[in-house]
Amino acid sequence: FNAAEFKRIEKALEIWVQEKRFKEFDKSREEIAKELRTSKESLHLYFATVMKMDFRTWRTELRIEESKKLLLEDKETSINIIGEMAGFSDRANFYRQFVKIVGCSPKEWRESNGNPDLKS
């Protein structure tokens, strides 16, 4: 546990999110750690200790938040393309993760304007 290293990782992750790097199709943990100028082990430890989840889960949640926004902002673009724009490389995984995290399908999310509980 190194507080200075964790602070550095936190700052690098903030920039990574601002730049929407989470939308890049799956890279290895080694590649991402390298981009963040840290080791794979330090990145794993940061997520386990600070975030209380693994990196892939966190990245998936960022992608789902992005897709929720895109589904409402851009109603002309197909749901499959929205999934790709948010960083999902395959349609089935996008739908599965969306339903798991949001509790409804991307189509239901879009049709309800982001309020799936208020179905008309």
How should each PLM-predicted stretch be described?
Residues D74-R110:
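Sequence-specific DNA-binding recognition helix
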